[in-house]
């Protein structure tokens, strides 16, 4: 059974944060992986994707200067390093597997990141 489990969310102050996605039930090292998010009351926004060997990483242009996607195939884990997060980055963050037919075939449940200076 394919499972994707995100972690690292919660209430954070503006600045940096690290999200993780632990994968199981498939050969993680053979698949492209992706991050996406959905802010409250808004549609889903694709963040970026990474190829199996980490040699190709694509980002949504507006986010590429604040987010870094990486992976550790030995640990079956995908990462999203976020810098300069602000209140508008409050969202439910998901990881997803890109299937062989060019679409996302499995999604995690997501982890909620709430950015607040209070």
UniProtKB/Swiss-Prot annotation:
Example GO biological process: immunoglobulin mediated immune response
UniProt KW keywords: Adaptive immunity, Immunity, Immunoglobulin
InterPro entries attached to this UniProt entry: Ig-like_dom (IPR007110), Ig-like_dom_sf (IPR036179), Ig-like_fold (IPR013783), Ig_sub (IPR003599), Ig_V-set (IPR013106), IgHV (IPR050199)
Lineage top rank: taxon: Eukaryota
GO molecular function term, any single one: antigen binding
UniProt keyword DNA repair, yes or no: no
Any single GO CC term annotated in Swiss-Prot or TrEMBL for this entry: immunoglobulin complex
Domain Ig-like: 1-111
Note from the entry: This chain was isolated from an IgA myeloma protein that binds galactan.
Name of the protein: Ig heavy chain V region X24
